[in-house]
């Protein structure tokens, strides 16, 4: 326990915050190539077939990324943009694919909350 005098002289040292998205290497987004596109099941108590992809990033690291929205056009060798953000019920999935960027099409017929899904305004 430091004395008041020691705290006045040195102060407290803040612990460095650990990044949750190490594969992005400090970038907000990274480009990558899909190596495998598949479905996986969430952990209890949920039940579904979640769409995910293994992506080799431009940083050289291979990660598992979630494909949000209903329906997608991704296959092996598709070029995608990856952002951080985990999926709570899929263990090991800590990244999201950005819809409407590079080879990924936006979600079709989406009317509300379009921004996150790369959907254009309906005419």
Swiss-Prot record:
One MF annotation (Gene Ontology) recorded for this entry: structural constituent of ribosome
Entry coiled-coil feature ranges: none
Sites of 3-methylthioaspartic acid modification: 89
Keyword set includes ATP-binding: no
Region annotation (Disordered) ranges: 1-21
Pfam families (UniProt xref): Ribosom_S12_S23 (PF00164)
Any one biological process term the GO annotation gives: translation
PROSITE patterns membership: RIBOSOMAL_S12 (PS00055)
Key words, A-Z: Methylation, Ribonucleoprotein, Ribosomal protein, RNA-binding, rRNA-binding, tRNA-binding
SUPFAM superfamilies on file: Nucleic acid-binding proteins
Keyword RNA-binding part of the UniProt annotation: yes
GO cellular component: small ribosomal subunit
InterPro entries assigned: NA-bd_OB-fold, Ribosomal_uS12, Ribosomal_uS12_bac
PANTHER family xrefs: 30S RIBOSOMAL PROTEIN S12 FAMILY MEMBER
The name this protein goes by in its record: Small ribosomal subunit protein uS12
UniProt organism field: Bifidobacterium longum subsp. infantis (strain ATCC 15697 / DSM 20088 / JCM 1222 / NCTC 11817 / S12)
